[in-house]
Amino acid sequence: MAYITRELERKFLKLNDFFKVILVTGARQVGKTTMLKHLAGSDRTYVTMDNTMARDLAQSDPVLFFQTYKPPILIDEVQKAPELFEQIKIICDESDEKGLIWLTGSQQYNMMKRVRETLAGRIGILELYSLSAREKAGLVFDTDLDFSFATLQARQRKVPKNDVIQVFQHIWEGGMPQVQGVDDELRQEYFNSYIDTYLMRDATEVGGITDAVRFRKFLVGCASLVSEQVNYSTLAESADIAPSTAKEWLNVLVGLRIIYLLASYSNNELKRLSKTPKLYFCDTGLCAYLSMWLTPDTLRSGAASGHYYENYVVMELVKNYAYAKSKVNLTYFRDSNAKEIDVFVEENNVIHPLEIKKSAAPDRREIKKYSVIDKASLIRGNGGIICMCQEPIPIDADNCFIPSNLI
């Protein structure tokens, strides 16, 4: 398989010229090592903490480890040898060289606190997700996403028209690099192996989860709640565990970057807002496998298709902003009357409200809900309805129907 250019490369190279250490986090198998090896020069040493001998040396004698594996260096799965962080700090303090040490880590559950305590001010931290639809298509947009009609029109000129069959092919296939272009049998075997080896092993190491049968049932339970508010009682029932255990297991999956929780919007001026997050899978292909959707067509025509489409759009937004120049805050809005807005994109104190609909011609009256923003001292920016329409269409001066392939 040919190398697929990752959108994170631009940001990584920029931070590499500024920080002495760069850490790229993300779930197992999303392409962290592949990307960094692609960017590394021939003089950069590579070592993985999956190697037992290298890991034992790193844990027992970090000084000797760096004498053996000299910087500039790429250390894979560094969370398995947290003993290295103190020595990395010493190396950074003794050198002015930027980009000296590259790290990857796939378990954020316990690692990040140690990293921030030890390497504050010395390390740049980035997150890589599985392949986005844009990356798979080789698309690069010249304009930042601001949801204005002009920006959407500029993006539309670079892409083919939205196609529901292609969208659900991507949703069903997912973005794991190793399943791109493989047949159905190999895809199923890949995800089965991914759960039984990587996921189960990491869940045991990080969260002490040892019951493989209940853990798989819990994963299936999570897949059944995709794009819905988290319900710990329902998750607990799916795996015959206590709700408190379900909360712990979900936190493990969030730390392993299998699950993404979209926080609810909070504002002191707007009363009685929900505080419960919504549940999404970082990779829709894994979610579809767990729910036994055997083909893209059955998923597209199935009862859960709208939920999967929402999951797809939310994660495309997450990926877009994870790799973008500016930072934003992504939330959703829901009040005690069940009035809900699927996504708030908050940037520079401006809120861009977005609804997500699988339809190619959703009801334009959906945007009336956005007036709730005006009840507080908030600035409402451009927004709209992300859907399966084939080109951007203005709804009013501030909102558009937005083709989902433009995000």
Which ranges hold each PLM region?
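Conserved P-loop NTPase "ATPase switch" module shared by AAA+ and STAND
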Residues: 68-84
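A short beta-strand-to-loop transition that corresponds to the Sensor-1 phosphate-sensing loop
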Residues: 104-108, 114, 129-131, 387-390
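Short regulatory helix/loop adjacent to the ATP-binding pocket of P-loop NTPases
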Residues: 109-125, 138-142
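Conserved catalytic/switch belt of AAA+ P-loop NTPases
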Residues: 86-109, 116-117
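Short glycine-rich substrate-engagement loop in P-loop NTPases that contacts/grips substrate
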Residues: 44-72
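A cross-kingdom feature that marks ATP-driven nucleic-acid transaction machinery
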Residues: 1-29, 33-49, 71, 251-252, ...
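Interdomain hinge/linker elements that couple catalytic modules in large macromolecular machines
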Residues: 138-316, 331
